[in-house]
C-alpha cells in the first residue's frame, strides 16, 4: 500500500486550538446565561425585598465561576500546543479537542441549570426565606456538573503527548 505522505499531524494544532476555543466559548456561554437568568430574578426580587439583594447574589457568582473553569482548560491546552518545540500529533490534537468539549459543554449545561434554579430560587426566597438553604444545595449540585467537566478536561489534556514514545 502506497503512503500518501499525509499523516494528519499537520492539522493537529487546529484541533488543539479548537479545543481551547470550545472550552472557553461554551463555558462562557453557560456563565453568561446563568448570570443573566439569575440576575433577572435578583432584580425582580429586589423590587419587593431590597434587603435580600446581597444574600441573593449567590447564583450570579456561581454562574460567573463557570467561565473561569473554561479559562483554566483553555490555558492548559494552549500551553501544550507548540509544534515547533516538540512533535504534536493528531492524537494530541484530538485529546485537546475532547478536553475542551468536555469542559465547555459541562460548563454550558451547568450554567443553564444555575440560571434556571437561581432565578426561581431567589424569587421564592423573597416570599419564603426557609427556601434559601434548599436553593443553595441545588446550586451546588449544578456547579458540580461543571467541576466534573473540568476534572475530565484536565485528565484528557494530560493525555496529550502520550501518543508516541519519543
From Swiss-Prot:
Taxonomic superkingdom: Eukaryota
An annotated GO cellular component: vacuolar membrane
Annotated site, Essential for proton translocation, chain positions: 143
Record-annotated membrane-spanning stretches: 14-34, 57-77, 97-118, 131-156
GO MF terms, alphabetically ordered: proton-transporting ATPase activity, rotational mechanism
Cytoplasmic face residues: 35-56, 119-130
Lumenal side: 1-13, 78-96, 157-166
Localization in the cell: Vacuole membrane
A Pfam family reported for this protein in Swiss-Prot or TrEMBL: ATP-synt_C
UniProt keyword terms in alphabetical order: Hydrogen ion transport, Ion transport, Membrane, Transmembrane, Transmembrane helix, Transport, Vacuole
UniProt cross-references to InterPro entries, sorted A to Z: ATPase_proteolipid_c-like_dom, ATPase_proteolipid_csu, ATPase_proteolipid_su_C_euk, F/V-ATP_Csub_sf
Disulfide bonds, paired cysteine numbers: none
Membrane-topology annotation of the record: Multi-pass membrane protein
Subunit structure: V-ATPase is a heteromultimeric enzyme composed of a peripheral catalytic V1 complex (components A to H) attached to an integral membrane V0 proton pore complex (components: a, c, c'', d and e). The proteolipid components c and c'' are present as a hexameric ring that forms the proton-conducting pore. Interacts with APD2.
Task performed by this protein: Proton-conducting pore forming subunit of the membrane integral V0 complex of vacuolar ATPase. V-ATPase is responsible for acidifying a variety of intracellular compartments in eukaryotic cells.
Family per similarity comment: Belongs to the V-ATPase proteolipid subunit family.
Name of the featured protein: V-type proton ATPase subunit c4
The species this protein was found in: Arabidopsis thaliana (Mouse-ear cress)
